[in-house]
Amino acid sequence: MIDLRLEEDILTATLPEFLTTRPKYRYAYTNTKQQDLRLLGPMRHVRLTHLYKHTKLWNLQYIERELTNIEIDDALDEFMQTFSLPYTIEQGTYKYNMLLGMHAHNIGYQDDVSELIANNPQLLNYLNDNPLASIFELIDIDLQIYQYGQNIFNNEVEHMILFLKDNTYHGVIQALQKHPFSATHVTWHLHKHIFVFHSREKLLNKLLATGLEDSQLYQRQKTYSTKRGDRPTERMITYIEDDHIRRIQAVLPLLLDNIFDVKLHRDSSMTWLKSYADTIYDSAKNSDSTVTPEIRKLYLRMYNQYMRVFLPIEQYMLYDTTCWPFSEKITLKINVRLISSRENQPVSWKTPIDTENLISIVQPDNPINKLNFTAVPSTMIRLNDNIMMYRSVKDMFAAIEYIPDSDENIPTIEMKEQALSRYISPDSEAQNFFNNQPPYLNSIINVNKQVFEAVRRGNIQVSTGSAEHLCLCMYVKSGLIVGRTVLIDDKVILRRNFNASTAKMITCYVKAVTQLYGEGSLIYPGLRIVFFGVETEPAMDVLKLFYGDKALYIQGFGDRGIGRDRFRTKIEDALTLRIGCDILISDIDQADYQDPSEEKFDDITEFVCYLTELVISNATIGLVKISMPTYYLLNKISQNINNKFSKVNINIVKLSTQKPYTYEAYLLLSHGSTLTTKGYAKNPVCDVYLEQISLQPQEIKIISTISNEINYDKPTLYRLVVDKNDITDVSIAMHILSIHCSTIITRSVMVKNDNTGAFVTMSGMKDMKRVAIMNRMTDGTNENAYMYEDNGKLYLQKVPYLEDLVNAFPNGFGSTHQNDYDSSTSVINVNALVRQVVYRVISKSIPVALLESLSRIRIVGGRDLGEMNAVYKLYKTPVEVYDTVGITREYPHVQISYRAQRYQFTESIPNHTLLLANYVIMNDIDRAPISSAEQINTIKKIISKIGVGSIAYVQVYTDVVARHINVMTKNDSFLISANADKTVFKVQVSGYKAVEMCNYEQLLQLVSDNTGVHIIKLTYQDVLESCVLSSGILGDTGSWLLDLVLASTYIIEIRG
């Protein structure tokens, strides 16, 4: 499909001519005597603002008769003489981003992005097919574009298009979940985006309108007259859990033939659709004869799976991998009959943080714990922890490889004592808990499934020997038709015995063949591969299917187990056959934690040294699992191998298909080393393992009664049930939840047939940032009248009164449904998690002695107030935020002032000030990267300017680990690169411009030269604590990038 919106964008060289040419238009004089003038092409985005009230075009809307073509043409000609857009002409094929240019014009250059454009119109010029790339290099937020009515005389905002900074499917899903009245198409012009509406009604009307548009598109598709740029379907996806919207979304695919034939006005068609959705829902629920059993079953599935798009064959055949990833073909349709309409309106509330006009004097005057609340069980609402985790094919076989970092490979006594102490200590239960969460394995299976479905539909062609081909073989047991491309036979049989270990083994294979032969096909006829520690590993069947009729020698030896004695015989027996191979992969576990002792430890160490020697003796390249990656073990292996062989590479590898919190690593063994370094002294994989952690997982705490205690120490779901008819109890419960939760979901619960049995369930997950902000509330006297402390614990003294929540009560509370649930967990990417860790470490590092003496908090670059997580204990201390994005304003009720200006590090830091400068000193305000030397100089300025009793925390990225990376897969999360002589290292984080990492030795020198300056390193303990408290599960990048990101992120503490 071709992007029609891109085709509307014109060459910058032709923009002057465009701005003097009268636009095409459509005109009508409506039955209500209103002028309706709609400009076509790029000019349809123009908003006729009050700046043009003196033009003829403005005054046309007030004429109470039908206009002539001459009047309209004359008015448009005059308008084009006054209309302008910011631009810079560039010759060649540079195009002009018309949508963004029009947006800046329409709002009078009043937002931050429009100001950037006004100052530098060249940002609107682009090559290729990504017109937003330049803008997203300068901003780290989603891009908001307002859309107005098609009639140029309608200046009201209809909705907002939100172009997403996270330009992935996962980013779209997160945005839909964040914005309650939002939807997205199944394909995206320009860049992935969603549509955000101001109300449920506007969202519903949009979904109905696109349903009607889809019926017309469907008629064209049936006659094979689809136009360039047509989507497979015009219907949209929404994540709002609204009963009536789900009814409508579920019935639309079944009515595409019928809706087109209903010759009604659009409003009448929408009313009819709303009514008919109720009819089908009742029929399906009650199993009456209105619909067949097959349609009933399909309808209920579509109702419950509202995030999936269901397509008739004509639309399904146009679907490809660039579309919304969750789709299904249907073959059924239903006939139509009409009944009366009714609607149900569930409510999802976003509680306000902008408190300027929303908080009034506290009510009631009594402490919360003296109020009486009615509580009833709400067992209808289950707690769901099996959330979706997403990954792509390109990330499926990612890996990072570290080289030795020390000239010496001597396993010292200190190293042994450290390793033995760690061996005797049990693993963290919290780590084991997170590793065994179902989303991890499901995400791997889902990638394979998506490739399978795309091939079966004919939407993609998969080349033989490609990564996609390998994904198919992990999903299919038999039934692939392999030629130049791979097809799927009708009698295909799916694989049932796929597990997490299989995915690791396949990723080991990919790493090994890429190391041997470079990038390209993953099939090499005649390859010889051996697995140790397995005899019937499914990975062997996967590779046999992958190779098909091409020659492959593959064999496995040994059952899975622990220790030397169980394996030595089987492996030695195998080697008596003189098996020489290209690749040898060992998946033998070595950690025996039953009755650990020094004797067992020595036995394991000896066995692993023996095993690695066997591998490199019999293979060109080997990968050996290391269950306990300690400096002692790695140097012992290095010493043993280097004493017996010459020029052997012994590198540490982490794989993307390992469990996200795993300790284990793989040793990559190969011949031909040119390194002078042989040992390990500071590797992040070893550092993480050697931490001794005894952290227990915490089950989510469900609070179902009113409590005034503020709890920071447990993941908490608040679920309150109150009498729906008692407005006082309802109001107070809602306000209590608004202190703890950024989102509240309400549901009506009827336990009797009369109003005496009407209750409302209110639920929401604790949001730490929300709590930290709302705890700061005052009543306007600069005294925190809401909080009090007792024995080190915080309690709410009174309830804040949030006006907007009470005003929304008439909209209804919604109701429960069959698959209703509260989600207890969320997926978090590695950078977002480490940012949480930074805040947590800072909060623990602030000296207790300073908590009472600090008079202000300064946050640099804190537009999203994330740093509030770091200062939640300082809820009485005023906050000053400095960020160039946004507008200057005061939030007096929460003691926060926002200053839209650049913070000058040359300014003196007042006495008794806490300064937070996280994720800012490596970029200028225009997002231009700053060198390591300049970053060090900024820290020196802070040191020289810090006042008495003040303290500063500055986050930096250091190159201490980057210099020891041999190879890492390109990725969108944390990508490190180096200059030619590997003296300067850069990191690209989450798609931003690559920035220089601070030189490690210069940081050490900085600490040495200045008293009161310390380096704080992040620990794995901090990671697990953050995950436990937030109920966040690390995404697929965790397994191979977490160690690296942790070791590369330092906090510099500066005390005055």
From Swiss-Prot:
The keyword GTP-binding applies. GO terms for cellular component: viral outer capsid. The keyword Methyltransferase applies. Its main location: virion. GO terms for molecular function: ATP binding; GTP binding; mRNA 5'-cap (guanine-N7-)-methyltransferase activity; mRNA guanylyltransferase activity. Belongs to the orthoreovirus lambda-2 protein family. It holds the Pfam family Reov_VP3_MTase1. It comes from Aedes pseudoscutellaris reovirus (isolate France) (ApRV). It catalyses: a 5'-end diphospho-ribonucleoside in mRNA + GTP + H(+) = a 5'-end (5'-triphosphoguanosine)-ribonucleoside in mRNA + diphosphate; a 5'-end (5'-triphosphoguanosine)-ribonucleoside in mRNA + S-adenosyl-L-methionine = a 5'-end (N(7)-methyl 5'-triphosphoguanosine)-ribonucleoside in mRNA + S-adenosyl-L-homocysteine. This is Outer capsid protein VP5. Its EC number is 2.7.7.50, 2.1.1.56. The lineage of its organism: Viruses, Riboviria, Orthornavirae, Duplornaviricota, Resentoviricetes. It is an enzyme of class 2 (transferase). Outer capsid protein involved in mRNA capping. Catalyzes the last 3 enzymatic activities for formation of the 5' cap structure on the viral plus-strand transcripts, namely the RNA guanylyltransferase, RNA-7N- and RNA-2'O-methyltransferase activities.
